[in-house]
């Protein structure tokens, strides 16, 4: 089913009201390349609406990637200006000194990532993973959580057959019956649960001090050269999340919002409402707070990096993770 731009424009009344009717005049078209993934979040409605392009005058190239590690590599090579990545690949990038900055928490992962075992595999607990084949995107938040889960159960990566796969590859391997378990997010998670059982979730580990999140990062060079774009972008991100917080009950199958999320993520529309509900989205005040961009996010990156180093996934730690996080753009957007 397709939906017209007027329907999405109606869904974005709250966003349009923030700015007025006309887009800013620009001398020449500027371009930004944005790397996104398949997480079900309100930003997909913004992407479909065209509001970012309209309000900034920039041409936005939306490029889909299979995992945060791929996004970080593309940013490192100069092919991407802004991208979505989980706290684990962001921590790895910061540890390597990549000149990027986390400026927005896309979501608190909460229960949106889960360890699922195939029915009939004999896996009833994390300890039962010993000797089994488990797929996960390496250096992702799911990988970080899986390694922590194994450690807590007295196992290591050597005790299981770990396969590094992107989400689409995991979906295909699960369909073929090639893997026994996976730690992954929707829409692959939704498909796996149809003939699998949830063994653990990200929320279980968050309650033990191993919280994970997805963030939006930009290269320091792009941020410095495009401050007005960054402020407008964050205003629109905040408006999209606020709209979901206020009207989320109406984001149902058949709504333009769900259609947009399904289109950009590749998820089935019927899976989108539950996919969105599995995450927690922060308001502007929470974003800028000391628990998040005001300090907590940097501490989370440090803790994640230390764990990654203990697992041999990074070789060095940054002396300070604060320079890789900023609340300044959120504060500017809130004015």
Q: What role is predicted for each listed range?
A:
Residues 70-72, 90, 170-173, 188-189, ...:
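Short, hydrophobic alpha-helical packing/hinge segments within bilobed ligand-binding/sensory domains
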Residues 21-27:
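Sec/Tat signal peptide C-region and signal peptidase I cleavage site
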Residues 9-20:
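Bacterial N-terminal signal peptides
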Residues 1-11:
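Bacterial N-terminal signal peptides that target proteins for export
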Residues 298-335:
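Conserved C-terminal helix/tail region of periplasmic/extracytoplasmic solute-binding proteins
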Residues 28-156, 161-164, 180-186, 202, ...:
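Short, glycine-/small- and polar/acidic-enriched structural segments
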Residues 224-313:
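Secondary-structure end/capping motifs
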Residues 106-117, 198-222, 234, 321-328:
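Periplasmic-binding protein-like
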């Amino acid at each position: 089913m397709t939906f017209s731009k007027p329907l999405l424009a109606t869904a974005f009344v709250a966003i349009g009201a923030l700015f007025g009717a006309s887009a800013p005049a620009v001398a020449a078209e500027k371009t930004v390349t944005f790397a996104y993934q398949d997480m079900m979040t309100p930003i997909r409605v913004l992407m479909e609406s065209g509001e970012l392009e309209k309000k900034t005058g920039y041409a936005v190239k939306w490029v889909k990637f299979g995992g945060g590690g791929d996004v970080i590599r593309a940013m490192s090579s100069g092919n991407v200006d802004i991208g979505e990545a989980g706290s684990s690949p962001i921590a790895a990038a910061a540890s390597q000194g990549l000149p990027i900055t986390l400026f927005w928490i896309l979501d608190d992962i909460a229960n949106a990532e889960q360890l699922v075992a195939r029915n009939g595999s004999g896996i009833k607990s994390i300890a039962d993973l010993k000797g089994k084949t488990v797929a996960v995107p390496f250096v992702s938040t799911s990988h970080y959580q899986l390694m922590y889960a194994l450690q807590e159960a007295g196992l290591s990566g050597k005790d299981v057959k770990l396969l590094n796969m992107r989400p689409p590859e995991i979906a295909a391997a699960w369909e073929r019956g090639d893997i026994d378990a996976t730690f992954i997010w929707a829409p692959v998670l939704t498909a796996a649960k149809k003939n699998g059982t949830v063994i653990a979730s990200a929320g279980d580990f968050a309650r033990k001090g191993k919280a994970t999140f997805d963030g939006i990062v930009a290269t320091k060079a792009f941020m410095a050269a495009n401050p007005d774009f960054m402020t407008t972008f964050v205003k629109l991100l905040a408006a999209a999340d606020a709209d979901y917080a206020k009207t989320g009950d109406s984001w149902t199958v058949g709504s333009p919002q769900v259609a947009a999320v399904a289109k950009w993520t590749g998820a089935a529309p019927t899976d989108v409402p539950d996919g969105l509900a599995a995450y927690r989205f922060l308001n502007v005040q929470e974003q800028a707070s000391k628990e998040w961009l005001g300090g907590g996010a940097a501490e989370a990156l440090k803790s994640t990096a230390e764990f990654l180093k203990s697992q041999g996934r990074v070789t060095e730690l940054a002396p300070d993770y604060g320079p890789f996080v900023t609340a300044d753009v959120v504060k500017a957007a809130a004015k």
